[in-house]
């Protein structure tokens, strides 16, 4: 029920200077699409938005023959997504940024009935770097939060984590940004900055137009966890990220950071690729990635979106730690996992695909007509799906309305602050050369070469424009461009 998962503030009613506002923050965001919906196939309802693309010859494996090749020219679409992973990056920059990139990749893969991530981006906003051997005149000494990594440590480790996951998964990062900002306000003396950083992960993926819309999970369909085992990591990450800095305990801060495993995510993606390549016979009816809240969020969302309930067998959930309690098993945020609704008639075909790709998976439950969620150690009958009639001692036994019923709408009141009067800039006392050197040496302006060359920018073979331009290959490109296929000239 965190802000991360339920967006209570973004859906709240707002009063500004005593005047009721006509739209919530989310309604303001959605208003752009409402005014200009053309060419958009899906927006604000799935793990990523989908936009109409150009006809393309997608390079993929034929599900019948098992051979790879470029098929006939077919309509295509592309998925786009940007999200942040700020709190984990503030606590542990490398795994925080790595799992941020990984979570965005999973969102593209879990769009519709399966998409394919193609190219990515990474971005960072931090406070002053305060490099010990390179002090800068604009960096004033002040106390920093000891429970968060310093801006310098974030920029040393975070970009490496994001680049490592992208490359090890098999996706290039072709653009991004880096900003360092910190300023003392003239009247209050408060220092504004990014002690809690922004870690931005985004990307573009490909998806077949006929796979854009999820199909409802039907009673009797299997609920499958695809990917790695559960471990006691990332517990409470979605909740911790929704708290103000310093409100959570130090133990929760470190427990809430996930760990990355790009190889496992690649195996999952190969399974998804093989499923959507089957076209109308795609065994995946609906998909969600496992992120904030772990299975406690992903499985109920999968069922709720289809208007069904479910019986979930705790004993069937893969785990690497046999000591996990039901709460830990249900709520941990172990990465590289997807929750899939698999058509019962295609379950054997799905299992065969997973075996071929050596990708772990488990049937952990079944959808039911009754909109009720039962989570327990359910005895299995002869089928690979838990008995939906089981009503033993349960860890969770609640109606779905209790999770997704309309909660009281939050009311937020705010006032516009007075515009600060900044002192007039005295240019007469400036040394032009010194001013120029300061501007050029500021991290937001200086070369980003060290953030670009840490990763392979050509992996996948569909990059038409990366960060490096010109005869001296300087990272000055103002865009990244990917191609739709290996023979055409269209792309994003």
Role assignments for model-derived ranges:
Residues 1-381, 388-492:
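Glycine/proline-enriched, intrinsically flexible loops and inter-domain linkers
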């Amino acid at each position: 029920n965190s802000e991360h998962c339920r967006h209570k503030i973004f859906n709240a009613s707002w009063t500004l200077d005593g005047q009721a506002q006509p739209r919530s923050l989310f309604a303001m965001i959605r208003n752009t699409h409402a005014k200009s919906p053309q060419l958009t196939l899906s927006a604000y309802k799935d793990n990523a938005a989908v936009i109409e693309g150009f006809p393309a010859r997608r390079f993929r494996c034929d599900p019948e023959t098992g051979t790879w090749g470029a098929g006939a020219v077919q309509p295509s679409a592309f998925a786009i997504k940007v999200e942040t992973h700020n709190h984990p990056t503030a606590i542990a920059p490398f795994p925080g940024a790595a799992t941020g990139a990984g979570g965005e990749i999973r969102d593209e893969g879990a769009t519709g009935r399966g998409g394919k991530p193609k190219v990515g981006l990474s971005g960072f906003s931090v406070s002053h770097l305060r490099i010990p051997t390179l002090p800068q005149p604009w960096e004033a000494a002040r106390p920093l939060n000891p429970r968060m990594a310093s801006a310098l440590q974030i920029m040393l480790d975070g970009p490496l984590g994001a680049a490592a996951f992208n490359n090890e998964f098999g996706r290039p990062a072709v653009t991004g940004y880096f900003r360092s900002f910190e300023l003392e306000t003239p009247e209050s003396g408060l220092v504004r900055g990014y002690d809690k950083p922004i870690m931005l992960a985004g990307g573009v993926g490909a998806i077949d137009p006929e796979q854009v819309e999820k199909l409802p999970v039907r009673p009797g369909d299997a609920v499958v966890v695809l990917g790695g085992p559960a471990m006691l990591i990332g517990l409470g990450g979605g909740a911790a990220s929704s708290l103000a800095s310093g409100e959570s305990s130090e133990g929760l801060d470190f427990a809430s950071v996930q760990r990355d495993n790009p190889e496992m995510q690649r195996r999952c993606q190969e399974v998804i690729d093989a499923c959507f390549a089957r076209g109308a016979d795609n065994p995946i009816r609906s998909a969600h990635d496992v992120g904030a809240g772990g299975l406690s969020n992903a499985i109920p969302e999968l069922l709720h979106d289809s208007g069904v309930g479910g019986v979930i067998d705790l004993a069937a959930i893969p785990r690497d730690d046999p000591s996990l309690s039901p709460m830990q098993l249900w709520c941990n945020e172990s990465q590289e996992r997807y929750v899939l609704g698999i058509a019962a008639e295609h379950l054997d075909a799905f299992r065969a695909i997973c075996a071929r790709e050596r990708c772990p998976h488990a049937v952990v439950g079944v959808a039911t007509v009754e909109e009720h969620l039962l989570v327990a150690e359910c005895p299995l009958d002869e089928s690979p799906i838990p008995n939906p009639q089981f009503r033993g001692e349960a860890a969770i036994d609640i109606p779905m309305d209790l999770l997704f019923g309309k909660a009281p709408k939050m009311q937020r009141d705010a006032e516009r602050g007075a515009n600060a009067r900044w002192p007039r800039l005295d240019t007469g006392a400036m040394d032009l050369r010194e001013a120029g050197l300061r501007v050029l040496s500021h991290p937001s302006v200086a070369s980003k070469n060290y953030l670009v060359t840490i990763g392979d920018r050509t992996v996948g073979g569909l990059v038409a424009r990366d960060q490096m331009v010109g005869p001296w290959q300087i990272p000055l490109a103002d865009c990244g461009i990917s191609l739709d296929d290996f023979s055409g000239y269209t792309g994003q």
